Amino acid sequence: MVSSEDFYLRTNNVSHMKVVITGGCGFIGSNLAHELVDENEVVVIDDLSTGRLENNGDLLDNENYRFVKGSITDLDLLKQIFDGARYVFHQAAIPSVPRSIKDPAKTNEVNISGTLNVLIAAADNNVTKVVYASSSSVYGDTPVLPKEESMVPNPLSPYAVSKLTGEYYCKVVTEIYGLKTTSLRYFNVYGPRQDPSSEYAAVIPKFITKALDRESPIIYGDGEQTRDFTFVKDVVSANILAAKSSETGIFNIGGGKRVSINELAETIIKASGTGTDPGLTHVEPRDGDVKHSLADISRAESIIGYKPSYTLDDGLKETIGWFIE
């Protein structure tokens, strides 16, 4: 993993590099804040609609950390916050396929208009680079595996449409205004600080919570659908590598291996250490879910130097340990 020390630009009479993390109290944003705060001035903006203040509770007294409660839909606020920033890590979003289907208008407002605001504010403040959190959902249910960045997108939900639109805005802003941008297509990120309590929580924290409570995990569909799961520390590393790189464009960020949801659930039950097997509960599949997903990460490996450091077993062990604590 790339360390914050590698990322820190050491220059005379400058104590820290300023970086801004939108959605920095969320799952991925808070992990990124913890990685960068020792050697950088980290400013987090989050409206706490899905992020949690306690994710960065241990940073509140850190002189390198500053929290601003606000929304990326507030362009004037973003322009103020981005003043003097070297990099912007844009993680803020409504991060859920089911929620986007339930409320497409709000998803559009935050994920599309909010992203455009981030890009405008960054360009106006001469930010060196914006790293944008996109999603593997832009590929849709294309049967070809693994997913390559050159594939024609086929979004199946308002969330996926919003993430793809954000990529297009990044590309256009780079070409017209000269702001360097990189879009990272995340594949099923998991790890510490991921909220299991939300109605729209991701599968791994839900499964872990069920396993620790000795309850049967709920699986949508037959469970034979497959996913490429990526540990959050590898995603943090990818963000830092993308920021440091002079390259722009789109990169898949995944683990490079896939596992069925049934197998995932069974692995989590065993790794939970409860000594019980509550079995699996299957229910009707959800709208907007894809059948199979697997990242081709060769472009990220060759261009920005990304290489996943955590196997699924390693990542689950650390994640379950965090939930137990």
Where are the model-predicted features located?
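N-terminal Rossmann-like NAD(P)+-binding domain of SDR-like oxidoreductases, especially those catalyzing
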Residues: 3-189, 233
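Generic structural signal for alpha-helix termini and adjacent loop/cap motifs
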Residues: 31, 51, 103, 121, ...
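Residue-level signal for the nucleotide or nucleotide-sugar donor/cofactor binding architecture
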Residues: 51, 73, 102, 110-113, ...
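Hydrophobic alpha-helix immediately C-terminal to the catalytic Tyr-X-X-X-Lys motif of short-chain
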Residues: 165, 169, 173, 203, ...
